[in-house]
Design a protein with these regions (language model features):
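Short, internal strand/loop/helix patches
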Residues: 17, 83-122, 126
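Structural microenvironment flanking redox-active thiols in thiol-disulfide oxidoreductases
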Residues: 48-92, 103-110
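Thiol-/selenol-based redox modules, centered on thioredoxin-like
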Residues: 118, 123-150
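N-terminal targeting or signal-anchor segments and their processing/structural boundaries
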Residues: 20-22, 34-37, 74, 106
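N-proximal helix/coil linker or "cap" segments that precede and/or mark the start of modular domains
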Residues: 1-22, 27-32, 58, 83-90
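Short active-site neighborhood of thiol/selenol oxidoreductases, capturing the structured segment around
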Residues: 25-47, 53
Length: 150
């Protein structure tokens, strides 16, 4: 039953700073297919998955996919979370919208989207409905292709 509820849930709106300090509001992308990728610079599996995210972006962005990465950098163990985040974005060549409130696991996005582990992906359709969560690279590829009629 829970999976059915989640599949028909609307994606909560949020506003967060991007990597350049500009405010970004999620609802500005209404009407687009969106892939949210939640990660952090200190998360080894996240960093290992970043090349797959780059591949998805390169394959689907010009065909209608918007990608947003949200970093959970800002844990108490980090002495310079913003620098860690910026360096990882640069090193991993993440060229799409990058957001973080630099609050680590206390980030408001965590509760809004019920995120318990990272990396974590959330696929949101053009109507703002969450249609997939924590999907594998293969599953994302397939689902995005289907939605964009490719």
């Amino acid at each position: 039953l829970l999976s059915k509820i989640i599949k028909t849930a609307y994606a909560p709106d949020f506003t967060m700073e991007d990597i350049n300090g500009e405010l970004f509001t999620f609802s500005e992308l209404k009407g687009k297919l969106i892939l949210l990728d939640v990660w952090a610079s200190w998360c080894k599996p996240c960093r290992e998955a970043n090349p797959e995210m780059v591949e998805l972006y390169n394959k689907f962005h010009n065909k209608g996919l918007e990608m947003i990465s949200i970093s959970l950098d800002g844990t108490p163990e980090q002495t310079s979370p913003k620098e860690d985040w910026k360096k990882a974005v640069s090193n991993d060549k993440l060229t799409w919208t990058q957001l973080s409130d630099l609050k680590g696991w206390d980030s408001k996005i965590r509760d809004s989207y019920n995120i318990r582990s990272i990396p974590y992906t959330i696929l949101i359709d053009q109507n703002g409905l969450i249609i997939g969560q924590d999907l594998s690279h293969e599953a994302l590829n397939k689902k995005i292709s289907e939605i964009l009629n490719l």
